Amino acid sequence: YITIGLTLAIVVIFYIVGYKIYISQEGIYLRKIDLMVDWSEVEGLSHVWINEFRSRTGNANFYNRKTLVIYRKDYKPICVYNISLLSLFVAKLYSPKIKTNIVFASLATMVNVGLNGWVFYQLFFAGLESMNLGILFAWMGLFFLKALILPVIMTSLENRTHGDNLFHDTAYEKNRSKVVHL
């Protein structure tokens, strides 16, 4: 009963909120700009993390936007921000011949989930008294890798494959990527 209740709650929430993209056998429909991209136009798909720089009064932080990038043959790529890795799997299901970075994106997501799970376990089950300085430094190093190094590697690999289109935000420039932003 819990599973059915959760499923219904999720369906109702997403029905109210709406969707960003719709993936079908014909192609990918982008709701925000009312554009249908046929599979024949799609050169490749990738799921990358693009760092967004946010600056508020006295506060500055990076946020990793999980982004689906749709590379088109004769046009600029399209970035759909804050979207799940599952969209890449669904696209691969409908168009198996399309080039993707599904393996590397899946590994990066597993690292993210594993690291967050480790922190959750340590804080809520093992307790703070079992944590020592070595674990704290390990967390700091792994979060540095996750937040800064991994997104840079992901975008540089995609830029090497599809041309220099994806760039991270800096303190001086936002949305530097040469793409259509959604």
Where in the sequence are the language-model features?
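N-terminal first transmembrane alpha-helix
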Residues: 1-16, 46, 125-132, 136-138
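Sequence-level detector for tyrosine residue identity
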Residues: 1, 15, 19-22, 29, ...
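Conserved beta-hairpin
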Residues: 6-46, 152-173
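Non-transmembrane, membrane-adjacent beta-strand/coil modules in membrane-associated proteins
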Residues: 31-89, 182
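Terminal and domain-flanking low-complexity segments
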Residues: 72-182
